[in-house]
Regions:
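Glycine-rich beta-strand-centered segment in the early N-terminal region that forms part
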Residues: 20-34, 48-98, 103, 136-139
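Short N-terminal strand-loop motif that marks the start
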Residues: 1-63, 123-125, 129-132, 346-347
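Mid-domain Rossmann-like dinucleotide-binding core that forms the NAD(H)/NADP(H) cofactor-binding site
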Residues: 79, 83, 140-220
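Glycine-rich cofactor phosphate-binding loops and adjacent beta1-alpha1 units
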Residues: 163-164, 206, 211-285, 346-347
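NAD(P)H dinucleotide-binding glycine-rich loop of Rossmann-like/cofactor-binding domains
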Residues: 91-174
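Short glycine-centered segments of the SAM/dcSAM-binding site in methyltransferase folds
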Residues: 82, 170, 259-260, 287
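C-terminal hydrophobic helical "lid"/dimerization subdomain
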Residues: 249-253, 292-347
Length: 347
C-alpha cells in the first residue's frame, strides 16, 4: 500500500509498504478520506519524538473509510461497514477514562501521533481503541470527507461546551482557519446573536464570508471595531483559534463582563508564558479556560449533528490530493492558501 511516512523534521516520504496485519480484536480500515490537521503541519515542520529515521510514522489522525477486515469476533462491526474513527485511546484504564475524560490521560495514545495513522491506504485500528468504542458507524448519506472531519469538529464541540454559548451571545473567534470557521458554524448553530471572525489573512476572511454571509469579519487590529459592534461591552465569548500569545492577552482585555474565554489554539512551548491582567479576570468575573482533543461522547454528538444535517463541513475543503501529494496537501494548510486539505483514496 502507499503511505506517507514521517522520518523526521521536513522528511516525509511516500512509500510502498505492506498492508498492516491485524491481531484478534483489531480492525483493518480501508481509508476513504483523510483530512490534514495543523498538528500534521507542525509534525512535518518540527519533527516528532515518535517519527524517526529508524522508526518512521504514518501520520494523519482524521479518517473515515470502510472496514476491510476484522480480527476474529468483534461484536457490532461487519466487513464493508462505513465508519469513522476517533484517534485517541487509552491502552490502560484509569480514573480519567472512568470519568469520561480519557482524552486528558497523559498516557493516552493516538493514531497518527504515536502509531501509524490515516495518510495511507489502510489503517490498523488497535484492539484497545475498538473495545473503547472509537470506531463509529456512519450513515450512507454522510460522505467520507465529512466523516473524517468529525475529529476536528468534535474538538471544537469540546470548546463550545466549555464556552457555554447561549442564544444572543456575541462570539468573537480569533483565527479564520478551518478550525476558526468550525467554531463560527457551531456558534451560529447555538443561536449566537453575532459571530465575529478576526484574522490577518484577508483571503481566509473572504472564504469565511463565502461559507456564511452572516459572519462578521475583521482584518487586523480588532479593538475599535469590537467596541463598535458590541456597544462598548465586549464579546460574551472569545475563542482563540490561533497559536499567537498576544491574542490570549488581548482576549482578557476585551471580553465582556462575565465573559467566557477559551484558549483553543496551543502555543509554542517557548512562548507559552503569557501576561494576563488578573484584575480584569477578577473584577469582570471572567471565565478563562482551555480545551484539547475530545471525549468519545463529544465525538458521537458531533457525528450526530452532521448526520442530522445540522452541521455541514464539506464547504471547508478547499483542496483535494492523492496520497502521493501529501506534502502538497500539508503545504496548502501551512501557507494559509485555503481552509481544509484532504486526501482522497480510491473506493
Amino acid at each position: 500500500m502507499k503511505a506517507a511516512r514521517l522520518f523526521g523534521k521536513n522528511d516525509l516520504r511516500i512509500q510502498d509498504i505492506p498492508v498492516p496485519e491485524i491481531a484478534p480484536g483489531e480492525i483493518l480500515l480501508r481509508t476513504g478520506a483523510a483530512s490534514v490537521c495543523g498538528t500534521d503541519v507542525r509534525m512535518l515542520q518540527h519533527g516528532h519524538a515518535h517519527a524517526t529515521f529508524e522508526a518512521p510514522l504514518v501520520i494523519g489522525h482524521e479518517m473515515a473509510g470502510t472496514i476491510e477486515r476484522i480480527g476474529g469476533d468483534v461484536p457490532g462491526y461487519t466487513v464493508g461497514q462505513r465508519v469513522c474513527v476517533a484517534p485517541n485511546y487509552n491502552p490502560v484504564p484509569s480514573q480519567l477514562t472512568v470519568s469520561g475524560n480519557g482524552h486528558l490521560d497523559p498516557n493516552y495514545r493516538a493514531l497518527g501521533i504515536h502509531e501509524d495513522g490515516s495518510f495511507a491506504e489502510y489503517v490498523r485500528i488497535p484492539s484497545h481503541a475498538v473495545q473503547q468504542g472509537n470506531v463509529f458507524p456512519i450513515a450512507d448519506h454522510v460522505s467520507f470527507t465529512e466523516a473524517a472531519m468529525v475529529e476536528p469538529m468534535s474538538c471544537v464541540y469540546n470548546a463550545y461546551e466549555k464556552a457555554g454559548t447561549r442564544p444572543g451571545d456575541i462570539v468573537l473567534i480569533i483565527g479564520a482557519g478551518p478550525i476558526g470557521v468550525m467554531h463560527a458554524k457551531i456558534s451560529k448553530l447555538a443561536g449566537a446573536g453575532k459571530v465575529i471572525i478576526n484574522d490577518v489573512h484577508s483571503e481566509r476572511l473572504e472564504m469565511a464570508r463565502g461559507i456564511d454571509s452572516s459572519f462578521i469579519t475583521i482584518q487586523g487590529d480588532v479593538r475599535d471595531e469590537i467596541k463598535r459592534l458590541t456597544g462598548g461591552a465586549g464579546p460574551d465569548v472569545i475563542i482563540t483559534a490561533c497559536p499567537v500569545p498576544e491574542v490570549q492577552t488581548l482576549a482578557v482585555e476585551i471580553a465582556a463582563i462575565s465573559g467566557r474565554i477559551v484558549f483553543f489554539g496551543g502555543l509554542p512551548k517557548d512562548r507559552a508564558v503569557v501576561p494576563l491582567d488578573s484584575n480584569l479576570i477578577h473584577y469582570r468575573q471572567l471565565v478563562v479556560t482551555g480545551t484539547t482533543r475530545q471525549s468519545l461522547r463529544q465525538f458521537q454528538a458531533t457525528l450526530a449533528l452532521i448526520t442530522e444535517g445540522a452541521l455541514c463541513l464539506e464547504d471547508l475543503v478547499t483542496s483535494t490530493h492523492p496520497v502521493e501529494d501529501t506534502e502538497k496537501a500539508i503545504a496548502a494548510m501551512a501557507n494559509a492558501t485555503g481552509l481544509k486539505s484532504r486526501l482522497a483514496f480510491a473506493s
